[in-house]
A protein has these predicted regions:
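Early transmembrane hairpin module of multi-pass membrane proteins
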Residues: 2, 10, 14-147
Length: 147
């Protein structure tokens, strides 16, 4: 089996991915909750709602809801949120390929599982990258799709 990273490097890369994603979500959410200002003003996203769904909870009277994605709306927390999710998503894609190459099995059943794990890892990593490109306050439907 071909491997790019040593075992200790792979372990550190996986730890880094978890720290990046979880840490950036927690820090950016804390920044958003304490930021005040426009974050606490009424948010109306009905202009982005699909036709016929305009009355389905797209208005937040008390400001941005405490969703993880709310942290991607305003600076400076947006920088933390975007950096963590984008970098974590790219790292997840790369680690998916590393694990795929390390675990290439001989049997057909295990090969299907290995390919499935690779595909899902790449999709999840790509989805995290796309969340950065589609903030929920400006691109709601695409954000929901990628989330």
């Amino acid at each position: 089996m071909r491997q790019i990273l040593e075992d200790s490097q792979l372990r550190r890369a996986m730890q880094l991915g978890v720290i990046l994603i979880v840490g950036s979500c927690l820090i950016s959410q804390l920044m958003m909750q304490l930021g005040g200002g426009a974050r606490d003003e009424r948010v109306d996203l009905t202009g982005q709602a699909p036709e016929g769904f305009e009355d389905e909870g797209f208005i937040f009277e008390d400001g941005f809801p405490p969703f993880i994605s709310s942290a991607g709306a305003f600076m400076p927390e947006r920088i933390v949120f975007n950096f963590g999710l984008f970098t974590g998503g790219v790292l997840m894609i790369l680690l998916s390929f590393e694990v795929f190459h390390r675990t290439k099995p001989e049997g057909t059943k295990r090969n299907v599982a290995n390919v499935t794990a690779l595909i899902t890892g790449v999709i999840i990593g790509f989805s995290m990258v796309q969340l950065v490109g589609h903030p929920f306050n400006t691109s709601l439907i695409m954000h929901i799709f990628w989330a």
